[in-house]
């Protein structure tokens, strides 16, 4: 409630300030026009006295300066007025161009069996733990999202941008959700050499693609890996032909691990490792047919987590690594095939291994492999369609009884644009989760949504 009041108050103040800025610029423009007209009249009177005959009007430094200021003010007012639409909110802070963006999303979800965790599907609970007839209904607006894109003026060929983005999946009650941090980074780009440095929190380089699902988790825990974390990233691009590009990215990222075995209340095993995780990706983009481009990439990471085993200084390091391939392949004008395959170990913080990292009973990393494939159709008129499948398959030899041994899902959805800004959609999916030495769990999931983009 406090945040809602603050947000409304901020919006009110922002809009008032925005209007005041336009009004102030208009007044300045009016004053400058009057000054120019007065100077022109005085100059004309003096000229008529000295030279009665007609002659071309001379240019003066003062007049040129005032005309230039007047032109710049007119251009600035025109730019502000064009950007003042409620659904394209831009404003200037000094010389920074700041754009507000996001969407409001309302979801209604029915599950035929207990899904973890209802609002967003990860996996299905085992029939031995939960009655298989225990269906669920969820209503939520937590995926509502907003952010700010920030752009500074180009300076000596260097482009500086930033992003801040949040949603409401930060915990709290179902009707009192908390804000959650998604992105916050600065990016400096040398345009001539196509080299950039990024510092802050954003997506992993590992397996960078996502399928288009109405379910918030985009097949994470059932075939799609990769998340967000703090990082320092270096990127370089090369033009290798007409509409073709090679790109290389490398990043030092924070190692986000499980809570420590000995001190779970305050010590993170990734933090305790004492050094960052290394991520990298190489990608190529090539034109195919119908002026559409295909992209291919290979990516991966390596890091370590340190678990304290006792209070005498005994500890054990656990590796975390991955290797992934990604592809985007246009098939026709509005049809594309996208997907990823991967293999790795200790992938819980990357939403792999069905969110299992280390077998703490056997003190062993959990290996896993998986991937996903999606067919995307549209937009065709006001419609868009998606079909896809994903699977995450941990190594049974690394598991203890009761741990998740496989998780897969298949889905189909459609979106329809009611207006330029408002979209409705529906999705049906089937989920099946296997367990080591326990019964499986499966569920049919029906998901409807309404979205207002801004």
Regions found by a protein language model. Give the residues of each.
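Sec-dependent signal peptide recognition
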Residues: 2-8
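N-terminal periplasmic/intermembrane-space "pro-region" immediately following the signal or transit peptide
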Residues: 18-117
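Outer membrane beta-barrel
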Residues: 89-120, 126-258, 274-287, 328-332, ...
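Sequence/structural signature of outer-membrane beta-barrel proteins
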Residues: 111, 153, 168-173, 202-208, ...
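Detector for outer-membrane/organellar transmembrane beta-barrel domains
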Residues: 275, 280-404
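Outer-membrane beta-barrel "beta-signal"
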Residues: 416, 441-454
């Amino acid at each position: 409630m406090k945040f809602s009041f603050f947000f409304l108050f901020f919006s009110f103040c922002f809009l008032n300030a925005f209007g005041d800025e336009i009004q102030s610029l208009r007044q300045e423009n009016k004053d400058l026009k009057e000054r120019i007209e007065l100077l022109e009249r005085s100059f004309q009177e003096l000229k008529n006295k000295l030279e009665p005959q007609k002659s071309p009007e001379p240019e003066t430094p003062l007049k040129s300066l005032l005309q230039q200021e007047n032109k710049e003010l007119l251009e600035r007012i025109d730019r502000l007025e064009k950007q003042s639409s409620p659904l394209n909110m831009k404003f200037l802070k000094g010389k920074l161009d700041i754009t507000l963006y996001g969407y409001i999303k309302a979801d209604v979800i029915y599950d035929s069996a207990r899904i973890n965790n209802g609002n967003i599907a990860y996996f299905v609970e085992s029939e031995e733990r939960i009655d298989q007839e225990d269906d669920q209904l969820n209503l939520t607006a937590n995926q509502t999202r907003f952010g700010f894109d920030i752009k500074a003026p180009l300076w000596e060929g260097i482009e500086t941008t930033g992003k801040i983005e949040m949603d409401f999946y930060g915990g709290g009650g179902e009707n009192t959700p908390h804000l959650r941090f998604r992105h916050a980074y600065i990016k400096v780009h040398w345009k001539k050499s196509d080299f950039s440095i990024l510092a802050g929190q954003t997506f992993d380089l590992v397996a960078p693609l996502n399928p288009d699902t109405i379910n918030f988790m985009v097949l994470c825990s059932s075939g799609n890996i990769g998340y967000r974390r703090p990082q320092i990233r270096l990127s370089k691009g090369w033009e290798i032909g007409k509409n073709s590009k090679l790109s290389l990215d490398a990043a030092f990222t924070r190692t986000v691990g499980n809570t420590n075995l000995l001190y779970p209340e305050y010590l993170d095993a990734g933090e305790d490792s004492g050094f960052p995780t290394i991520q990298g990706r190489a990608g190529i983009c090539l034109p195919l047919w119908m002026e559409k481009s295909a992209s291919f990439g290979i990516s991966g990471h390596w890091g370590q987590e340190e678990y304290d085993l006792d209070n005498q200084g005994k500890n054990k390091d656990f590796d975390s690594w991955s290797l992934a391939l990604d592809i985007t392949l246009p098939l026709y004008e509005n049809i594309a095939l996208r997907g990823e395959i991967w293999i790795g170990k200790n992938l819980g913080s990357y939403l792999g291994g069905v969110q299992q990292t280390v077998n703490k009973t056997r003190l062993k990393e959990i290996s896993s492999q998986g991937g996903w494939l999606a067919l995307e159709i549209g937009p065709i008129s006001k419609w868009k369609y998606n079909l896809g499948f994903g699977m995450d398959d941990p190594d049974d030899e690394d598991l203890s009884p009761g741990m998740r041994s496989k998780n897969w899902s298949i889905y189909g959805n459609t979106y329809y644009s009611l207006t330029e800004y408002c979209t409705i959609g529906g999705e049906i999916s089937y989920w099946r989760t296997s367990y080591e030495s326990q019964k499986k769990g499966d569920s049919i999931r029906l998901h409807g949504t309404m979205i207002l983009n801004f």
